[in-house]
Structure formats: C-alpha cells, structure tokens
Swiss-Prot record:
Organism: Bacillus cereus (strain ATCC 14579 / DSM 31 / CCUG 7414 / JCM 2152 / NBRC 15305 / NCIMB 9373 / NCTC 2599 / NRRL B-3711)
Name of the protein in its database record: Queuine tRNA-ribosyltransferase
Listed GO MF terms: metal ion binding; tRNA-guanosine(34) queuine transglycosylase activity
Entry's cofactor comment: Binds 1 zinc ion per subunit.
GO-annotated cellular components: cytoplasm; cytosol
Gene name, Swiss-Prot/TrEMBL: tgt
Residues involved in substrate binding: D94, S95, G96, G97, F98, D148, Q191, G218
Length: 379
C-alpha cells in the first residue's frame, strides 16, 4: 500500500486541466491546489487553526532549515513534524537541494553529494541523497522530495546534461535510502532547464523508477514566463496520468492558472507571505500596496470582493497604519488575506474545471487583475 494515492476526477474539456484528489496518511486535498510554505515549521505569523479556516489541506516545510534549527533529531523526539507544530493535515518537505544551491556562497558538487557552508554561521556541511532521506524520514512528512541539483537559469546544455544525469543517479539512491515508503511518499524531480531533450531524458529516467508522484523542478529561477509555460507544455505530458504533478516554487496568480491549464496539480511559494510583509496585497482587481499614502483615509476593505477575516473586519487605512508603525498585527492581516486569496483562487480554478470553462475563467481573471495590460506589474 503506497502512502500517496492520486484520484483522477475529470479533465476540463476547454483546456485539458485536470481535477483530482491526493490521498495522504494525514487526509486528502483537492487539486489543483496551492500549498502555503512553513519554512521553519510555521507559515509566518499564521496559526494552524487559521490555515484550516482557509481550507488549506497541505503545507510545505523546509528540510534544510529544520536540519539546521532545531535539528531533525529533536523533531523526531517530539513525535515528528505534525506533532511538533500541531498540524494534523498533510505536510510536504522539500529535500534541501534548492537551499544548498541558492543560499550558500561556497559549494562543491561531487558524486556523493554537496559540500557547502551553513548560511547562518559559516560551518562546513555536507548533504547527500542519503542524508536528505534520513532527515525527511525523521521529520515524518507525508510527501518527501528526492535530493536533486537545481542549476540556475541560464545554464549551458552541456552543464545541464551532466546535472540531469547526476540528479537521476541521486534519485535512485534516494529510493534505496528511503526507510518508510509505507508512511511517506517520495516524489522524483524532473530537471533539464529549458532543453526539451534533457527534460525528456530526466522524465524517462524518473518514471522508470516508479515514484508515487513527480515534481517539475528548475523553473521559477529567473526564466521568462513564456519559457516556463513552454517547458511545462512539453514536460507535463511525459509524466504518468495516475500520479500527482507538482510545480515547485510557483505562486503568482497568473502562473497558478497557467500551470493548472498545463496539467499541474500542486504548487508552492513563499510569495504571498513574503510580499505581505512589505504591505503588498493580492486583490481581485490587481496588486495593491497598502502602505501607499492614498490609503491613509480609505476605510474600505483590502478587496471588496473578498470574504476573508481581514477584509470582513479591517480597513485599508487601519492596516496601512499598522504597517507604517511596524506592528506585527498588520503583517498578520496582510498575510492572512494573501494566503486566503490564493487558496480561494485555486477553488475557483477547480470549479472552472468542473464546469469545463477554465479558459474563459483565465481570460476573465487576467482582464480583471490587469495581466492583459501593457507593462502589467507582477509580483
């Protein structure tokens, strides 16, 4: 019995997007879905109860950061990550690979793994496929990610080819080192940059290993959105229909819709809480920076079309005041709103798939949000 099971429900006749449900040891969630990111075993400023009120069925935590603080052994002693953070729904943990390649100034890649420096204190560390599995097995997440190399954009074909081959070998080692396949599902990560030939090779390698789910990695690392969409168009069809598909590190509203249209089931990103901390809010009418002076006497909600806790109870003027005074409650209110906005957006996407009208929904949303305007601002 596998720990993770994907249930296909239907395909949107207008776009080919798919509606489904992922079953995990800690409950099920409908897809396509957005996963709030709780890097250090907390979604910044949010309580588990608030996330449940938004109907979040799965969140993401970070293997690299939890390995450094408080340490995976402490979390194991606490009974696993679910008990440690009082979250009884699904958790996905990444492998730590992205942080190793993005946060460390010094790193040396070899076949065994990666030597790098702790970004907190400069200590020398080593992370391998086996170590990434050991940490994630201790954390006890429902979905684990294989340890991979995530090259930046752009990278040469020659470098990316070697990287893909190494990532495939590391994926095989992850499968062998994974100690709890009946309790935790391990996803493989398809790499290959913008190169179709390499994406095909990576997908072929990983699909032959029969992971319970697959991620598309190496996107949202600086490439233009048209390249990301093109890569998804030739990569997603290479993945099994009966397994979940996860696009890593993507969370802008337009990319969530475009990813779903291209067959993606799961997304994650720090974007909604990161931009909330500087007062940037997602609304049904586009991007709103609540710190702006024009909102000082605006006593309406952040988004008149939103029914979240923030919008039902507090005004733009009040939230602006809190943000200008560096009050934590202001960050809580904007974070709550942004997370609710994306989770609600995904429910609208699922409903549009049910009604076979996701293409129409995309056009309506892009027009209302302002993505169709020349030089439209993104996040």
């Amino acid at each position: 019995m596998t720990a993770i099971r994907y249930e296909f429900i239907k395909t949107c006749k207008q776009t080919g997007a798919r509606l489904g449900r992922v079953h995990t040891p800690h409950g099920s969630f409908d897809t396509p879905t957005f996963m709030p990111v709780g890097t250090l075993a907390t979604v910044k400023t949010m309580s588990p109860e608030e996330l449940k009120a938004m109907d979040s069925g799965i969140i993401l935590s970070n293997t690299y950061h939890l390995w450094l603080r408080p340490g995976h052994e402490i979390i194991r002693e606490a009974g696993g990550l679910h008990k440690f953070m009082n979250w009884d729904r699904a958790i996905l943990t990444d492998s730590g690979g992205f942080q190793v390649f993005s946060l460390s100034d010094f790193r040396r890649i070899e076949e065994e793994g990666v030597h790098f420096r702790n970004h907190l204190n400069g200590d020398k560390l080593f992370l391998s496929p086996e170590k990434a599995m050991e940490i994630q097995n201790a954390l006890g997440s429902d979905i684990m990610m294989a340890f991979d190399e995530c090259p930046p954009f752009p990278a040469t074909f020659e470098y990316m080819k070697k990287s893909v081959e190494r990532t495939s070998r590391w994926a095989e080692r992850c499968l062998k080192a994974h100690e709890r396949p009946q309790d935790q599902g391990l996803f493989g990560i398809v790499q290959g940059g913008e190169y179709e030939e390499l994406r095909r090779q990576s997908a072929k390698d990983l699909v032959s290993m029969d992971f319970p789910g697959y991620a598309v990695g190496g996107l949202s690392v600086g490439e233009p959105k048209d390249i990301m969409n093109r890569v998804l168009e030739f990569t997603t069809p290479l993945l099994p229909d009966n397994k979940p598909r996860y696009l890593m590190g993507v969370g802008s509203p337009d990319s969530l819709i475009d990813g779903a249209i291209r067959g993606i089931d799961m997304f994650d990103c720090v974007l909604p809480t990161r931009i909330a901390r500087n007062g940037t809010c997602m609304t049904s009418e586009g991007r709103l920076v609540v710190k702006n002076a024009k909102f000082a006497r605006d006593f309406g909600p952040l988004d008149p079309n939103c029914d979240c806790y923030t919008c039902k109870n507090y005004s733009r003027a009040y939230i602006r005041h809190l943000m200008k005074c560096d009050e934590t409650f202001g960050i809580r209110l904007t974070s709550y709103h942004n997370l609710h906005f994306l989770l609600n957006l995904m429910e609208q996407v699922r409903q549009a798939i049910r009604e076979d009208r996701l293409g129409d929904f995309r056009e309506e949303f892009f027009e209302q949000y302002g993505f169709n305007k020349p030089n439209a601002k993104n996040f």
